[in-house]
Design a protein with these regions (language model features):
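Short beta-strand->loop micro-motif that forms the acidic, two-metal-ion catalytic signature
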Residues: 346-353
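Right-hand nucleic-acid polymerase module
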Residues: 22-184, 193, 197-215, 220-243, ...
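Intrinsically disordered, low-complexity polyampholyte segments enriched for Lys and acidic residues
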Residues: 14-18, 45
């Protein structure tokens, strides 16, 4: 009986083919792990290089036309997008890695002992970036002593405010903490922790805000808590759009950890020691015995590690700087589709023309991928896509054809003012506002800032109210 010839598992290579096979294997592994697309022709092989793909130019104009196919490859098919170093708040200052300098003499008070030897100290004060500090006009602070002198306090008092004397790096009770804690019920579900600094710490944080953080510009797309910007400027770029995509960041302030705050101050040019002290002065660690009102561990969990406190004067500015890279990337992505992007605190908004509607199926996951890559999370239940036939609202302002407030809100406030004229000014204070008159005046001023015509009608009614009745 004749047996069939068995084929070898690996074919025999001719001379010169072994090198080509090896290089092909290397190229396959590179595509597998790095996501680099394989060139389809010799011309593409020759033109391919190591430069950044043109699709990710973050400086493209807002009005740039979208790609012809309205489609960008999914992020996993290309190299990771990286923001230029000067635009990205990083823990490294400059390109050279700075090593810890060990000395036997105490370089400054409260210097940390070396782990290897208790007779030596680590000097973290010799790596400040004078050029970066000068660029923003920031005060030069090289040691904790200089920081305390700038704050007008003794070094011991500043060290006490940083919480370095707390057991296990956190206060054991609310009385020992430097913050007042108050739980507020959210509009949808759950609770939010408000952490208001006590008098001395609030004064220190206010000086850090005025003397350092206010001198550092936020990204142009950030409109929340930025001078000369408001909810109106945040909504204006989206007027007349065919679609509006609204995303919400979950636990925006608690998701900014202590390490990220230190990295912000390092990127501004401060040495590691001063950046750590500034980071501890502007972050919070909740007491060990603090419980949530609903008794759920998940409610307290986001606040367990040291984080940005909602209620501190420095938190909005630091939150904007922590999201700087997020703003750069989302703004660049929107520009590639001919869309627009703005952010007001934790509210992200993208909008675009009708020709970019087919790309929505990729814009949404792409934007959420960027958010996750920047170590934030989105609230899926608050994600909205509003078309032209719907009422498109951005931070409470209707943007379908022009900037205005909703008709329902106008009618409600008009009815309250009319009843105040008929029955007296305090008769309609059903919510129990401490100063109902100022409350109504503030709502009317809000209307005047957005829609002056409707605001004037409300103002005329307000002036007819008899507040002595």
């Amino acid at each position: 009986m004749r047996c069939a010839t068995r084929r070898p598992l690996f074919p025999t290579l001719k001379d010169g083919e072994d090198g080509a096979v090896f290089m092909g294997l290397i190229a396959f592994l590179k595509r597998l792990f790095l996501g680099t697309p394989a060139p389809s022709s010799d011309r593409e092989k020759q033109s391919s290089g190591t430069s950044r793909p043109a699709d990710f130019d973050t400086h493209s104009p807002q009005g740039a036309a979208p790609p012809e196919s309205h489609v960008l490859p999914f992020p996993s098919d290309r190299k990771r997008f990286r923001v230029p170093h000067l635009l990205r708040y990083s823990a490294k200052v400059g390109k050279k890695r700075v090593w810890l300098r060990i000395t036997r003499e105490l370089p400054y008070r409260f210097a940390r002992p070396n782990i290897a030897s208790s007779e030596e100290y680590g000097d973290l004060s010799d790596d400040h970036n004078a050029d970066a500090l000068e660029r923003f006009g920031l005060p030069v602070l090289r040691t904790p002593d200089e920081l305390a002198q700038w704050l007008g306090l003794s070094l011991g008092r500043v060290a006490w405010l940083t919480g370095r004397f707390f057991e296990n790096e956190r206060p054991q009770s609310e009385q020992e903490a430097h913050y007042h804690f108050h739980w507020v019920k959210k509009k949808t579900a759950g609770y939010r922790l408000i952490e208001a600094p006590k008098v001395l710490l609030k004064a220190v944080q206010t000086q850090i805000l005025r003397g350092i953080l206010d001198l550092v510009p936020a990204h142009p797309a950030a409109h929340g808590f930025v001078k000369h910007r408001s909810i109106r400027s945040n909504a204006a770029p989206h007027v007349g759009s065919a679609w509006v995509l609204k995303l919400d960041l979950t636990n925006f302030y608690p998701s900014v950890p202590f390490s990220r705050v230190v990295a912000i101050f390092r990127s501004l040019g401060y040495c590691r020691e001063v950046a750590i002290w500034l980071g501890r002065l502007t972050t919070s660690a909740i007491p060990s015995n603090l419980n949530s009102p609903d008794g759920m561990a998940n409610t307290v969990w986001p606040y367990r590690s040291r984080h940005l406190p909602q209620g501190a004067p420095t938190s909005p500015a630091l939150a904007n700087l922590s999201a700087f890279s997020l703003d750069v990337r989302l703004n660049g992505m929107a520009a590639k589709y001919g869309a627009r992007y703005t952010r007001y605190a934790d509210d992200l908004t993208l909008s675009g023309p009708g020709k970019s509607i087919p790309a929505l199926k990729e814009i949404i996951p792409f934007a959420e991928w960027i958010v996750r890559n920047e170590r934030f999370t989105t609230n899926k239940s608050k994600r909205r896509v509003l078309r032209r036939h719907q009422q498109q609202t951005v931070t409470g302002i209707v943007v379908n054809e022009k900037l205005t407030l909703s008709r329902a809100e106008f009618d409600q406030l008009k009815a309250i003012l009319t009843n105040c004229i008929r029955h007296g000014g305090t008769s309609q204070n059903r919510a129990g506002h401490a100063d109902f008159r100022s409350h109504l005046r503030g709502r009317i001023e809000h209307f005047l800032s957005v829609n002056r015509e409707r605001g004037e009608k409300l103002r005329v009614l307000f002036e007819q109210i008899d507040w002595d009745r």
